[in-house]
Amino acid sequence: MTLTRRDFIKANAAAAAATAAAVNLPLVPSMAQAATTDPATAGADIKWDKAACRFCGTGCSVLVGTKGGRVVATQGDPDAPVNRGLNCIKGYFLSKIMYGEDRLTKPLLRMKNGKFDKNGEFTPVTWKQAFDVMEEKFKTAMKAGGPEAVAMFGSGQWTIWEGYAAAKFMKAGLRSNNLDPNARHCMASAVVGFMRTFNMDEPMGCYDDIEKADAFVLWGSNMAEMHPILWSRITDRRLTHPDCQVHVLSTYEHRSFELADNKLVFGPQTDLAILNYIANHIIQTGAVNKDFIQKYCAFMKGDTDIGYGLRPTHPKQKAAKNPDSGKMDPITFEQFAAFVKPYTLEYTARTSCVPAERLKRLAELYADPKKKVVSFWTMGFNQHTRGTWANNLVYNIHLLTGKISTPGCGPFSLTGQPSACGTAREVGTFAHRLPADLVVMNPEHRKIAENIWKLPEGTIPPKMGLHAVAMQRALKDSKLKVYWQQCNNNMQAGPNINEEMYPGWRNPETFIIVSDPYPTVSAMAADLILPTAMWVEKEGAYGNAERRTQFWRQQVNAPGEAKSDLWQVVEFSKRFKVEEVWPAELVAKKPEYRGKTLYDVLFANGQVNKYKLDDMARQHGTAYHNEEARHVGFYLQKGLFEEYAAFGRGHGHDLALFDTYHKARGLRWPVVDGKETLWRYREGFDPYVKKGEGVRFYGQKDGRARIIALPFEPAAEVPDREYNMWLCTGRVLEHWHTGSMTRRVPELYRAVPDAQVFMHPADAELRGLKRGQQVKVISRRGEITLTLETRGRNKPPQGLVFIPFFDEGRLVNKLTLDATCPLSKETDYKKCAVKVVRA
């Protein structure tokens, strides 16, 4: 066998990933992965096609091999610009995620004596029976409490059209803005940060920045494990360019520190002080790009002491001077300089516990006009009671130096889910959003949506709906009666399970529906479980962290009676007549809708249903099945996408025509005249920036980005004498989120079967604990028992423990506090107080 240099690199990367996970590759020996990259050599009886990876927000493309109606193999797509033929260890086992032994294939309803009972046993029912019960529960709840009595909790793992259909069904059909995605728990702070600074969501740069940068700074991001393919590109850049630097900031050491030139372990929440110190250093050393800020920036000061997103009755929430306030007032550059001046090197070193020389080295990197810097961050910034502020403050640094919107330079918010950008954010499945950065609170935005959707004026309610944490509180308080969860496992992933989540789900007054392929913690706590099609069992589309939209075709059928989330929403919409859910005065504005169902109005409206099945056959060939399209009799996905795309075209969110994406390995929006945009807001790269403008942040009416003065403020809950340690939660390389897919892959489960608690050896010795012992981790809200680990990949400093959240047998969110960023409503999973004792 002859190996090219490319094959050799790929094979070694695969072997490295497998070694890290302590598993064997699906093809043995390791070189076999390189040897079978070309599908033509893998056997004529296997059919291959492309798909976006099912896991993180990187957006890798994989080749999917099918045979006999099953996915039998997956491999990295050598034509994909994102991953260039590589997979991480999870990607190598994608072929197994759909075939767990406990896959759900029929709807299951809690029943006793032949009818629904909240305390009954799960019993198989037909889809008609399931929808009959759902219909009765929805209509009863809405008759008594109006549209605000029902809610839907979606996902950054929804396909683009699943999220879009759900948004239409809830916000236009049922007229309820109680729709939120699980991306509220991971990306909401990034969204609000973008909107406050630029008034336009998502990164201005792209992954091409990696090959052009002189330095990388990771803020609360363990890319080595959470975005390993991007990390491989950073590693290549660092090791092949001797002057390249990597700086890593975190509250504990992890695998990304192994490549770091500058390691900064800071005290929880003090990243805010570090960010302000860097801004102060830039100003004090004369490193401000004065021309840039004079032309392209405006200065603001934000309200402070804004609380912690806790219940209004909580003492810390009651004590806040400006609870939940995002108000900003204009200031001058001189006032901004005075604001950050107290954040000296000495003060910041003392506050953060980071050695002064390391802080100074980091600040000098940003201040050096010759160094091109990319800042990456994920949950360390976002899952933070001041997560929006943290996002704003890192933008301040890049704006002060002009290191933004240019190749190799820029702030880059990474996403954790495959379509947190493409579905949750761009489609607008948040409780306050509509597609393309429109919001329900703005009457002009509502009018745009109503016109595109052919709805009477006043259909979309103007009040923001309940966000993720508020939904759980409303269920517990019996204000929310029906809750439909799709494509996530919130009973495991949501915060404060014991006090806020489980009581609401098992409240006798609530009805909980969970659509899932497996019997997850969420499914087992529900009243009705709907079996769901997964990944390539349906036609899909995701949008990744670099604004890249990617499509795939349905390649196999779902098992049994499992149906996609899209099918479920569209089919259920047939159960509602317009008159049943709209007030009479609204129906009177569109009398032609009288007697029609929500399906007729939303999905058979002359736009969504205008693409015929023969059009699908021409595009894909008859070899490809499409369950949803065959069921409704038209090319549903194409109709939904083209209607949705109308929101963004001509407004800086331009998407290409639907058919283009099936031919490409994704395109980065805005796509204008068939050309994708790599760097936004910069003349010569962005078609929306006119000749002579240089830079224009066109999301803002004046074209100027906001540099915002915001202080360091403490966390919601800090260690004390009894609960004397910080708890930080997160992930590991081998598992994804709650492990509902990866723990069903035997190789990944064997590699890391259980969650452990990582602790500094000195902390263990102080408590009389030893590595390998069973210990209890206890917070004010609950306790769990785990094995103690004082070595290995994660190395917390004294005073902090780390626990991953993938293990349904050790629910770490029994411990966490439901504090949120008051602006983004995103949960802070990184900071609460615990104690650790022998079990």
UniProtKB/Swiss-Prot annotation:
Recorded superkingdom: Bacteria
Binding site for [4Fe-4S] cluster: C53, C56, C60, C88
UniProt keyword Signal present: yes
Cofactors demanded by this protein: [4Fe-4S] cluster; Mo-bis(molybdopterin guanine dinucleotide)
CDD domains associated with the record: MopB_CT_Nitrate-R-NapA-like, MopB_Nitrate-R-NapA-like
InterPro entries: Asp_de-COase-like_dom_sf, CT_Nitrate-R-NapA-like, MoPterin_dinucl-bd_dom, Mopterin_OxRdtase, Mopterin_OxRdtase_4Fe-4S_dom, Periplasm_NO3_reductase_lsu, Prok_molybdopt-oxidoreductase, TAT_signal
One GO term of the biological process aspect: Mo-molybdopterin cofactor biosynthetic process
Pfam families documented for this protein: Molybdop_Fe4S4, Molybdopterin, Molydop_binding
Modifications after synthesis and translation: Predicted to be exported by the Tat system. The position of the signal peptide cleavage has not been experimentally proven.
EC class: oxidoreductase
Entry-linked SMART domains: Molybdop_Fe4S4 (SM00926)
GO molecular function: 4 iron, 4 sulfur cluster binding; electron transfer activity; iron ion binding; molybdenum ion binding; molybdopterin cofactor binding; nitrate reductase (cytochrome) activity
Entries under SUPFAM superfamilies matching the protein: ADC-like, Formate dehydrogenase/DMSO reductase, domains 1-3
Keyword tags: 4Fe-4S, Electron transport, Iron, Iron-sulfur, Metal-binding, Molybdenum, Nitrate assimilation, Oxidoreductase, Periplasm, Signal, Transport
Residues annotated as binding Mo-bis(molybdopterin guanine dinucleotide): 90, 157, 182, 186, 219-226, 250-254, 269-271, 379, 383, 489, 515-516, 538, 565, 729-738, 813, 830
CC cofactor note: Binds 1 [4Fe-4S] cluster.
Known catalytic reactions: 2 Fe(II)-[cytochrome] + nitrate + 2 H(+) = 2 Fe(III)-[cytochrome] + nitrite + H2O
Segments forming domain 4Fe-4S Mo/W bis-MGD-type: 46-102
Predominant place of localization: periplasm
Annotated signal peptide: 1-34
Sites where the protein binds substrate: F805
Classification via PANTHER family: PERIPLASMIC NITRATE REDUCTASE (PTHR43105:SF11), RESPIRATORY NITRATE REDUCTASE (PTHR43105)
NCBIfam families membership: NAPA, PRK13532.1, TAT_signal_seq
Family stated for the protein in its record: Belongs to the prokaryotic molybdopterin-containing oxidoreductase family. NasA/NapA/NarB subfamily.
Protein task: Catalytic subunit of the periplasmic nitrate reductase complex NapAB. Receives electrons from NapB and catalyzes the reduction of nitrate to nitrite.
The protein's name in its UniProt record: Periplasmic nitrate reductase
Gene behind the chain: napA
